Amino acid sequence: MIKEGEKVKVDPRLTGLDEWIEGTVIDIEHNPFKGLVIAIRDKFNRIFFGEQKYFIPVNEDNVCMQ
């Protein structure tokens, strides 16, 4: 489960950019039509938001969870 303040990466299909963008979760909304909608801010202060399926948590400990 993704939480506010957590570091995540956002899929290029959502951003329209060439690579995954890393940012900090600034808002999580429970949308009755789309489900969980997540908003992040990256290091350039750009804000991206979309459905949960476009975001993956960043594992800062570099620990394999398999």
Predicted segments with their positions:
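Intrinsically disordered, low-complexity, charged/polar segments
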Residues: 40-66
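Short coil-to-beta transition motif at edge beta-strands of beta-rich domains
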Residues: 1-14
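Short aromatic-glycine-enriched beta-strand elements
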Residues: 33-39
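A generic structural motif
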Residues: 29-32, 44
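Short glycine/serine/proline-enriched coil/turn segments at secondary-structure junctions
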Residues: 15-18, 31-33
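Short beta-strand-centered aromatic/proline hotspots
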Residues: 19-29
